Regions:
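Noncatalytic alpha-helical scaffold of FAD-dependent oxidoreductases
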Residues: 1-220
Length: 220
């Protein structure tokens, strides 16, 4: 239901199971996937955040324990709803809800960033950055998703209808100033998965030492 519940669930699963994946995405992200694919909503309840969890199923006791943890979360209200894949096909359909986000948002000329923060900083970072974007750019749809297990987060800002590309990119660069400054304050990285690139190059000094930057130049 909220980021605190998401993080609590992550820590519970990580402490009890061999977690192979713990992916988070928002209702907004899911909405775009449902709009542009043939996928169906996995359950009726809408919630701000969704997680996909994959654990190593060592034996029947592992599955029973995982189900017990989910049931406990639903009883406490931390988890609003959930579903369990029973077949390979069901698993594929559930994973498409996360994996099809990039394709679904590609229709809106997204401005993309992939960043990382310490796991403990994820809730505060997302909350603060989301508030800044809502205040400064209320017309932007901002799609968040990522790998909670390693603090890697993807941010796709979708170009509003009626905006020309130059104005949109200029506005997004202003977002970068706020975003990367916050990343620096939280000891994160301005580039999690997809490399530095020309856009992020001026900000690399915020999260990398001069020695690290020189090494990156040498191995390029």
């Amino acid at each position: 239901e909220d980021l605190a519940a998401v993080m609590n669930l992550f820590h519970q699963f990580r402490s009890q199971f061999k977690v192979q994946a713990f992916e988070m995405f928002t209702e907004l992200a899911l909405g775009y996937v449902l709009k542009h694919t043939d996928l169906q909503r996995p359950f009726e309840t809408e919630t701000p955040y969704y997680v996909l969890i994959e654990i190593e199923n060592e034996n029947d006791e592992t599955l029973d324990a995982a189900l017990g943890l989910l049931e406990s979360g639903m009883e406490s209200g931390a988890i609003l709803d959930g579903t369990l894949s029973q077949t390979k096909e069901q698993s594929v359909q559930l994973w498409r809800l996360r994996e099809d986000i990039s394709e679904a948002t590609s229709h809106y000329s997204p401005y993309k960033n992939d960043v990382s923060v310490r796991i403990s900083e994820v809730p505060g970072f997302l909350t603060e950055m989301d508030q800044i974007l809502k205040e400064d750019y209320p017309e932007f749809d901002v799609v968040w998703f990522g790998h909670i297990g390693d603090g890697n987060l993807h941010i796709n800002i979708l170009k509003p209808e009626g905006w020309n590309s130059d104005d949109f990119i200029e506005a997004c660069h202003k977002v970068d100033d706020r975003l990367f400054g916050m990343i620096q304050a939280k000891g994160g990285s301005v580039s999690a998965e997809h490399g530095v690139g020309l856009v992020k190059k001026p900000y690399l000094h915020l999260t990398r030492s001069q020695t690290e930057i020189e090494l990156m130049r040498q191995v390029r």
